[in-house]
């Protein structure tokens, strides 16, 4: 059973600006270290970061809470499996609320094109 669906789109140029300005404090507030390590070396680092941020926004929309209830951006991280498929890695309050909602899995899709990154999250019960 589907518990929630969230979608978000962001402008990649925002994240290019963060990288150009070397705004490490902001990047640390928005992204887990593993996310930064994955995206920074890539040719399209801004697209990579933008898609991950869109995933975080889509997750809190699917959860139905927004960023209330003490969720931090870094508690919602995006990883990739061996084939490159993205997945959510939740911790802290984000994981707690996910469990309290009765969710068993989160499905994630990312894309970027034409200056925008988009993410969709579907939360599913067992």
UniProtKB/Swiss-Prot annotation:
One Pfam family this sequence matches: ACPS
Catalytic activity: apo-[ACP] + CoA = holo-[ACP] + adenosine 3',5'-bisphosphate + H(+)
Known EC number: 2.7.8.7
MF terms in GO: holo-[acyl-carrier-protein] synthase activity; magnesium ion binding
Cellular localization per UniProt: Cytoplasm
Names of required cofactors: Mg(2+)
The protein's name in its UniProt record: Holo-[acyl-carrier-protein] synthase
UniProt cross-references to Gene3D superfamilies, sorted A to Z: 4'-phosphopantetheinyl transferase domain
Primary location class: cytoplasm
Organism of derivation: Trichlorobacter lovleyi (strain ATCC BAA-1151 / DSM 17278 / SZ)
GO terms classed as biological process: fatty acid biosynthetic process
Cysteine pairings via disulfide bonds: none
Keyword line: Cytoplasm, Fatty acid biosynthesis, Fatty acid metabolism, Lipid biosynthesis, Lipid metabolism, Magnesium, Metal-binding, Transferase
UniProt keyword S-adenosyl-L-methionine present: no
Function: Transfers the 4'-phosphopantetheine moiety from coenzyme A to a Ser of acyl-carrier-protein.
GO cellular component, one term: cytoplasm
Family per similarity comment: Belongs to the P-Pant transferase superfamily. AcpS family.
HAMAP family assigned to the protein according to its UniProt record, in alphabetical order: AcpS
InterPro entries from the UniProt entry: 4-PPantetheinyl_Trfase_dom, 4-PPantetheinyl_Trfase_dom_sf, ACPS, Ppantetheine-prot_Trfase_dom
Record: residues binding Mg(2+): 8, 57
